[in-house]
Amino acid sequence: MSEIGSYHDTIFALSSGRLPSGVAVIRISGPKTRFVYETICQAIPEPRHAALLTFRSRNGDAIDRGLTLFFPAPHSFTGEDCAEFHLHGGKAVVEKMLAVLGELPGCRIAEAGEFTRRAFANGKMDLTIAEGLADLIAAETEGQRRLAMQVASGNQRKLYSEWRQRLINARAFIEAELDFADESDVPGSVSMQVWQQLSALKHEIEHHIASGKRAAMLRDGLHVVIVGAPNAGKSSLLNFLAGRDVAIISEEAGTTRDLLEVKLDLGGIPVYVTDTAGLRETDSVVEKIGIERARARMAEADLVLSLEDMSGPVSVTVEKIEAETWLIGTKADLGGSASGLWKYHISTMTGSGLEQLLDALQAFAEAKIGQIEDAVPTRQRHINLLRATIEEIEKAIEGDDLPLELRAENMRLASQFLGRITGDVDVEEILDVMFSQFCIGK
């Protein structure tokens, strides 16, 4: 972001959705907010009370009439003077208002995430809360919304701040033993208690990291891959799950050459289901590429649905992969073997077994995710910094042959790594990347 640290400019942006709409909200933040009111409304409304005013250009022409709210610093989202203008959501109305604001001295259009970045810089939120807001905006399922709301509510911040304070307190005891070993008010050899406390903290962080895998699945989705021989009914199953015709269905074998993916919302959990090229020996170069991609996607899957036509001879062969694999018998309406090999029997012609399979997929997803009620790491940078924290704690605990000064330094570094998660310590290099992921107006 350009000159983002000075905050001398007053920024504005459309914060509501795509135009046209019933109502459009333009947000403003910065030192010229009161000047904007005096110029456009000829009045400054009472703080935090909606006022119905006419919005005018600098030459007095009426742009629109609508509600506006004024939030004086520091009691605002950004910590600066802020305002919201609620206009009718017509394209011409909004474009005119934005053009008028852009002509005012000291005012400019906001960059992506700039409102939230100013809130962070002014101490209105930490990095984890900002990330939670980004995830809340991006949430597409109920599970993703709940997870994002936990983070945006400050649960992570409270946990990491508590851990950091425990490290700081432990380090203070060690340094007190170093500096005041001869003083009567310093307990004799407190270091053993400190190492025990750090060991307990290390186990807490390790358990916390383990829960991050489930959070990542909820945030990024589970991946289910449909495989099988050509004409086993893979595309028909994908179309049923999607609720629409996504894949071409034909009597001709090998019509699916590339990966086809649909996203499902199963009980609030995002699940990506991929149809793949039929697995067989072929001379077709294009089909071979499709089969290679199918095998690569299988290797990344959380669950593989291996389909076989029940109306033909039983010849189930399952490729060796790490993911859980379900054997699904298809075309059950045509009869055939009732072999106990199949986990489910389905028919996309009659609908037999399809709802049971869908219920089973949801149960699988829910079992994988589990109940996420406590604060969990939701991003890879959290996990990386938590692992670095553990590494420094281990050095401090296991450094029996090291001077206490060095072990205290390990504790200082551990607390710094925790501070980087919340943004309390040395995070300037990640700010541009993080806030650029927000939309304009947030």
Curated annotation (Swiss-Prot):
GO terms for molecular function: GTP binding; GTPase activity; metal ion binding. This is tRNA modification GTPase MnmE. Its EC number is 3.6.-.-. InterPro entries: G_TrmE (IPR031168), GTP-bd (IPR006073), GTP-bd_TrmE_N (IPR018948), GTPase_MnmE (IPR004520), MnmE_dom2 (IPR027368), MnmE_helical (IPR025867), P-loop_NTPase (IPR027417), Small_GTP-bd (IPR005225). GO terms for cellular component: cytoplasm. Pfam families: MMR_HSR1 (PF01926), MnmE_helical (PF12631), TrmE_N (PF10396). The lineage of its organism: Bacteria, Pseudomonadati, Pseudomonadota, Alphaproteobacteria, Hyphomicrobiales. It is found in: Cytoplasm. Gene3D superfamilies: P-loop containing nucleotide triphosphate hydrolases, Probable tRNA modification gtpase trme, domain 1, tRNA modification GTPase MnmE domain 2. It comes from Brucella abortus (strain 2308).
